[in-house]
Amino acid sequence: MGDKIFHNLSGKTLVATPHVITKGIYHKSLIYMLSHTEEGAIGLIFNRLVNHIDLKSFFKIKNDEITTPVMVPIYLGGPVEHEKGFFLHSSDYNKNLLLDFHNDLAVSSNLEISEDIAFGKGPKNSLFIVGYTAWKPGQLEEELETNLWLVMDCNKEFIFADNPESKWHNALKHLGIDEIHFSSQIGNA
């Protein structure tokens, strides 16, 4: 048996396979892959809307110029470190980036972006996501081999679509998959 070839999925989207992941946080999830190396992987679920927050009060923005609440949706990025918040956003905003993917997406995690969004000076598109998803070395590869995930190229339209409930179905449609006809008896040839 030879060594397995590593395929870096950073900047790709994972689509939960229909009928395989049937409950919990990963059921019908879409995950944008922030980092994928032989040491493990990190991603953000971007279709789990949990609430709306006022940026001004959430980030304790002390500015009298903002007199009304600035409500933004808040998404659950995964089961790890819910106290950490990230903005997955379009690359038109490039101040103090945490990650820049060179595919029209970036990630920020600082107070400055929240203030800029509150003042209307932030990125054209953004999602505020708390928590993240992480895999140990080899864990994601094992999940891919057992067909828990489909992989698709990054698609900003899916990430920033207005209706989070339809994102997963639209991703399947983009991949040419009809959920009704997708077999739960899948495997590798």
Curated annotation (Swiss-Prot):
Coiled coil: none
Signal sequence extent: none
InterPro entries named in the record: AlgH-like
Cellular component, GO annotation: cytosol
Entry superkingdom: Bacteria
Record-stated family: Belongs to the UPF0301 (AlgH) family.
NCBIfam families: PRK00228.1-4
Name of protein: UPF0301 protein RC0043
UniProt organism field: Rickettsia conorii (strain ATCC VR-613 / Malish 7)
